[in-house]
């Protein structure tokens, strides 16, 4: 069954690839309906089902302005990595192995959704990141197998409450520091066929660039971190891997607008609100 799913998803992506070799997939709401689609300019070609399960164009076309884009996938697992750019380490030595952690699936939100600050939070930061979307079941994968198992990539924001992460009020695990509701913005599209090893990542806060670095400067590249994870946790189609944030980060406040802009993918935009 898994093999059929992988083959179907791959064939759909290949069929929908544009002249530049890329395909952009979305999940969207139109009225009360939620559906999957392929984005082509300002139009969304509706699919018969989930693009990860081989959904194909069903003949219905929507104008992009007439639909609400949602988080493009609903992952069964969210894996993330800490300290994966030297620019984010400060004076700390680079890790000897990928330092992975979980984010709960309830933290996922989509483009233009609000990042809602918990009432007792005091120091919530943005973390713009490239996110890999898994396309096939991976267990004990080699780096080459892990690379082949990536369906596509999207933008993510690993929103983090620093006091709960490492301050006086820190928890044993980062369940609320990085997993509170809306702390996992994702989207706006999943792009296939893109060389994600050297993409420029920029984060803007209220229009000002606050993070800017190429994914070529990851300490552990995407296949390496996925292969490492698969030694211990089986990855399934639709799971996502946040690949780390560069540089320094700052506190967000209600009313702020944060944008994660990755070359070849697009812009993930969210407004910050209080609960």
PLM ranges: what are they?
Residues 3-10, 16-98, 194-196, 202-204, ...:
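N-terminal non-catalytic cap/leader segment that marks the start of a structured domain
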